[in-house]
A protein has these predicted regions:
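Protein kinase glycine-rich loop
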Residues: 76-83, 87
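Juxta-kinase regulatory segment immediately upstream of eukaryotic protein kinase catalytic domains
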Residues: 2-68, 76
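Protein kinase catalytic-loop region centered on the HRD/HxD motif
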Residues: 197-206
Length: 206
């Protein structure tokens, strides 16, 4: 008999939660560094096929001094919903210094969390995207770690806050748990070891 069969879902009475009081306030971080977003349609060169495509929904950082961007993001399919908007997949483009065909496709992918400023102001959710940006940029200063998700770029325009991150082709752990349910012990040990490692990194850095 499986002794853990009854542990399909954790549960707690409301009184138990109430006794513990409200959640602790998040740690204070410096204000996040958010650049200005430029969204354009442009010609893109594909080095694999040598084709030139007219592409829409390209986003890059507009520098105040007028210098050209190093990279751009070709925003594509929707991956999932989030509290303030959606998460979409992107192809990273590199700048070619060619006025007629300014961008070139690379093999690198990204994910962008597109959050509506209107929803951010109206919902007043405990998960503050601006604090999330500041926290992720702060942690990224400590260097790279395979289990720490940093940001590639954080941009904004009048309508949206855009957080560009590395693309994880297998999704996230929450989605994996939703799909697979309860893990066998060896697999749970594998994931939990990573959680402990990243917790140690974050605590040590803070």
């Amino acid at each position: 008999m499986d002794e853990l069969a009854f542990l399909e879902n954790a549960s707690a009475a409301f009184e138990d939660i109430e006794e513990n009081g409200p959640a602790a306030s998040p740690l204070p971080f410096d204000i996040g560094n958010i650049g200005l977003a430029e969204r354009v349609d442009a010609a893109v060169y594909n080095p694999d096929t040598h084709d030139v495509l007219e592409v829409s929904n390209i986003i890059y950082e507009r520098h105040p001094d007028g210098r050209p961007p190093e990279r751009a993001y070709w925003v594509g399919r929707k991956l999932k919903k989030c509290i303030f908007g959606v998460v979409k997949a992107c192809t990273i483009l590199k700048f070619r210094h060619d006025l007629k065909v300014p961008w070139e496709v690379t093999e690198h992918k990204a994910a962008v969390k597109i959050m509506s400023w209107q929803k951010i102001r109206e919902l007043r959710h405990i998960e503050d995207p601006q604090k999330e940006v500041a926290a992720m940029q702060f942690v990224s200063k400590g260097g790279t770690h395979p289990h720490v998700m940093g940001t590639l770029d954080v941009l904004q325009d009048e309508e949206y806050l855009l957080m560009f991150m590395p693309f994880c082709s297998s999704g996230d752990l929450f989605g994996f748990v939703q799909q697979e349910g309860r893990f066998p012990e060896p697999l749970a040990r594998y994931w939990f070891k990573q959680i402990l490692e990243v917790s140690y990194v974050v605590i040590s850095f803070l």
